[in-house]
């Protein structure tokens, strides 16, 4: 009947409009899976003797930057080199012995703890293992 056909068209239109409006909300609530495989550890391209005390070097941990720091006392520490404020890459400042984000002047201590500026959280710590002349950095400090 004509009434059934009109009801079908109206219902279909409202249904399509509801899907059109809810799709972005659902995409926001359920983020897509990352295409990058999970990486547990990486070898860094330097030997322990090549890294002087009170220095830092940036390395790749998968597709993300990491920072390897040799403290003034000679201890190796590693962190995710992504600032927890707006994801800028951090760097080590030898003269101040801290990890610094140049984007908004965020400062982290040598334990990765946020000490000043806008960063809301500490840097993600990594575990450092020295095996002979090889330095291996792993997640899960």
Report each predicted region and the residues it spans.
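N-terminal pre-ligand scaffold of iron-sulfur
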Residues: 3, 7-95, 122-141
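Short cysteine/histidine-rich metal-coordination sites, predominantly Zn2+-binding motifs
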Residues: 97-105, 115-124
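Active-site and channel-lining beta-strand-loop segments
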Residues: 107-108, 128
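A membrane-cytosol interface segment of integral membrane proteins
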Residues: 110-119, 136
